[in-house]
Every structure is written in structure tokens, then in C-alpha cells.
Amino acid sequence: MFLFSLTVLSALVLITESIPSVATDFPFFEITKKFDDIETYNNDYGILKFQEQEPMENLTCASCEAPSERECTLNQTAVVCDQDPNIACLTFEAFNNFTMTTTFRRGCFLSGILCENACRSFNASQDGNLTSCVQDCCNSSLCNAGSLPTEVTTEASTTAQETTATSTTTKQSTGASTTAEPSTTAAPSTTTKQTTVASTTATTTKPTTAPQTRATTLPTTAPTTAPAPIACGGVLRGRGTFTSPGFPGNYPNNVRCEWRVFLPRRQAIVFRIVSLDLADPGDSLEFFDSGRVIRTFRGLSRRKRSPSHRQTTNEKVLGEGEDGYYDDQEYVDYYYYDGRRKREPYFYQRRKKRRQQDRIVIQGRNQVAGAIFQSDAAGNAAGFSTQFVQGAADSESEASASSESSDED
């Protein structure tokens, strides 16, 4: 028994020694080790990195430049960019604060690392006058191409189909008349008379009636609904005059007009109100500086004389002969009436002027200033007329601007 167990133990030892080692002899570990060596070799020489950043060949981008996105889309063309890994398709829109214009552009752009270099380079070419700029870069062919809405095109196509349909029906009807007549008169042996009669009737009667009535009814119904737009507002430059719509006639209801001007440093603009006649408190003329309203004129909400008020014969003005302490250039007269609006004032007061009511001076600080006119639906009047002069800031304009108070009486 002892000898049998000894032989079995020796046999097991021989079997275990003959089994190959998993850590060294199995071929799978040799294969993975070879792949690890290849990966480290590629990383050392940058082969994998070069394959990931390989540029796209023949990148095609949409190219156009216009004041609006719609005009740019209408005029866009496809261009092939240079083969460069840093070139991308660009779309950007910028607003120039000095010229008050918008530029919309598409095309190839050498972006480098950041796409925002487009706004920086364009702002440098515009002397730093851009107030807003939006850019977008992409790296697939025609990824920056724009498209227009299909509503206008479908209407045009449907009208074209209707006109073509009417023309085809008239031609078919004339062809039927020419073929029907020879079939009925095919019994006689003479064929020359039949051909002459068919040609005369087909050319004289059919084409003159159907196309004319169809063409006159379709185009006359559509273009009668669009109202004429009211043109007002704009960009102010140099010197000139701007007025309310329809001046010296009454301005329309529910209208808003805005005039803007860009004021660089060491420049100023002077507004002088020549005439002012507003109907009610819902109608106003505002002057703003950098989005902040600095002066507002409204319709008569208080029984006080406005800058456009004309003196009547019943109003009394104190002169230097009656009161030596008053000066007409430094004081203004106020007349108060009762609820029935009698012409005779029941209360009269003379107060010293705080500022010139018809003159507004704004100093330049590289900002946007201007005026806004608004009217409601309660009524209308003659409106206003304002003169403006833009130029270099002097001591007189600075002194007049500093003497003006911020609130209106």
C-alpha cells in the first residue's frame, strides 16, 4: 500500500511540471506585449496624434458679405479653402457704432486655436468701433451656408403653375377643334377645302378670349393690402434739422421715431428746438445719452406755458419799467387758469429760469445719443422741428451743459 501511494504521488509531480506556465509560456501575453510596444512607439513619434488632427481636404465654405443675413444668403457662393489644418468655415455678424451699420459675413477663416480671432481682427480693422460681434466656426463642407424661408418661393411657384395650366387648356381646346372638323367632313373627296377652313377658325376665335380674362383677374387682387410705411428716424451727422412725421402738418397716431448719433471724445452735439406742439401727455419728445433719458417734453399736462406757447393780448408781462428787479432774459412768466379754461388767468407768477428750455447740449464720451418721438392714439398736433450741430466741444458748450439741471419743472 505504501508503494502504491508513492507511485501515484510521483506521477502527479511529473504531470504538474509538464504543464506550461501561464505567465510566461501562454502566447496571449506575448501578443499584448507587442501591442504595448507599438503604442509606446507611436506615442513617442506622434503618429497617433498626427492622425487625429489630420486636416480635411478640399474644405468648401459659403462666402458672402452684406448688411443683413438675408442679403448675404441671397448672394452667397461656394468657395474652396486652402488646405490648412487651421482653416474653418466662418459666420459672423458685427455692428459698427461709429457708422451705425451692420456687417454680416461668411467665408473661409484661418482661425488658429480660437474662433474669436475673427471679431478681434475685424474690430482692429474698424478702429475699435465695434459694439457687438458674434462669430461661429465649423469644419465641414458648406456648414456655414444659409437658407431662406420657403413661403415666398411656394407662392410664386403656385401662381406660375396656375398661369401655365390656363395656357395649356386653351391650346388643347384649339387642337380639339381642328381635329374634330376634318372627322365630320371626311366623306367628300376634296381635302383642300377642309384644311383651309380648320386653319382659319382655330387661329381667329380661340386664342383671343381665354388667356386675356385669366391673366387680368389673377394679378390685380394681391398687391392692394400692404399699407405705406411711415418713414422717420435715422442717423444724425454734422448739422441739419429733423422733424416729426408730416411736419408742419399733424403727425399720425401710434408712431415711434428714433434719431441716433455717435459722439467721439472731444466732440459735442447741440439740439435746439425751433417749434414744439404736442397734443396730450401721451405724446412725447425725449433726448437720451447712452440709453439714459436726460430731457423729456410732453403734451400739456399742467397749465403751464410750454416753449411753443405764443403770448396773447390778454396776458400781461412785467417789464423793467414796472419792476426793476426783474430781467426778461432771466425770468419766465407762468399763467394758471381755472377748470373751465378761461382766457383770463386767475393766478400769475413770475419765476427765474433754471435753464434754456429749447437747447440741449451733450458731450461726447464715445457713446450713442439722440432723440425719440412717440405718439399715442388719443390725438395729434403739428409736432416739432429741431436743429442740431455736431462738432468739436468748446468751452461755451461745456458751460451750457453743466448749467442745465437734470429734472424738468
Curated annotation (Swiss-Prot):
Broad class of the protein's primary localization: secreted
Report the leader peptide range: 1-18
Region annotation Disordered: where it falls in the sequence: 154-230, 389-409
Please give the superkingdom of this protein's source: Eukaryota
Q: Where is the composition biased (Low complexity)?
A: 154-229, 392-409
What GO MF annotations does this protein's record show?
Answer: serine-type endopeptidase activity
Enumerate the PROSITE patterns for this protein. Answer: CUB
Write down the InterPro entries for this protein, in alphabetical order.
CUB_dom (IPR000859), Sperma_CUB_dom_sf (IPR035914)
A GO cellular component term found in this entry reads: extracellular space
Q: Which SMART domains match?
A: CUB (SM00042)
- Tissue-wise expression: Component of the acid-insoluble and acid-soluble organic matrix of the aragonitic skeleton (at protein level).
Location of this chain's protein in the cell: Secreted
Domain CUB, chain residue ranges per copy: 232-338
Disulfide connectivity for this sequence is 232-257
Keywords in alphabetical order, please: Disulfide bond, Secreted, Signal
Q: Does the keyword Membrane apply?
A: no
Q: Which PANTHER family match?
A: COMPLEMENT COMPONENT 1, S SUBCOMPONENT-RELATED (PTHR24255), CUBILIN-LIKE PROTEIN (PTHR24255:SF31)
Please report the name of this protein according to its UniProt entry: CUB domain-containing protein
